[in-house]
A protein has these predicted regions:
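Aromatic- and charge-enriched surface segment that lines or borders ligand/interaction sites
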Residues: 43
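A short, exposed loop/beta-hairpin motif centered on an aromatic-Gly-Thr core
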Residues: 29-40
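Short aromatic-glycine-(Arg/Gly/Cys) micro-motifs in beta-strand/loop hairpins
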Residues: 12-29
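Short, positively charged
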Residues: 3-4, 11-17, 35
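Short, charged, surface-exposed hinge/linker loops at domain edges
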Residues: 1-9, 46-105
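Short amphipathic alpha-helical segments
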Residues: 27-31, 74-76
Length: 107
């Protein structure tokens, strides 16, 4: 599958520090675009990602797979301290749910 810029995961938010809208893209954490409007921030970043994809392909690099195109197993191994584990088990027991149900409710 050849990913295109519009297939990636974008987010636009207001930055009080910058006094402008900032667009970011999950698959390229080092890229962002700042503009006066949400629309300009997003469209500018999509154009930037398109340029980056061209550059990556020309240099033989493999672009990241868009998050929406990845497959997920539904399983996730979680490591925690013994104390955290004890607290989670106790809280789950107090709520009358399994540890798995408790942790899923927190996500």
């Amino acid at each position: 599958m050849k990913a295109t810029a519009d297939m990636y995961t974008y987010r636009v938010f207001w930055s009080g520090e910058d006094g402008a809208f900032v667009a970011s893209v999950s698959e390229f954490p080092s890229l962002s675009n700042i503009a006066d409007s949400q629309k300009e921030a997003l469209s500018g970043l999509i154009e930037l990602v398109a340029d980056v994809l061209v550059d990556m392909r020309e240099s033989g690099e493999q672009p990241p797979v868009p998050l929406g195109c990845r497959t997920y197993s539904g399983k996730y191994a979680l490591r925690m301290t013994p104390e955290q584990h004890r607290r989670v088990v106790m809280e789950a027991a107090e709520q009358g749910v399994s540890v798995n149900q408790l942790l899923i409710s927190r996500v």
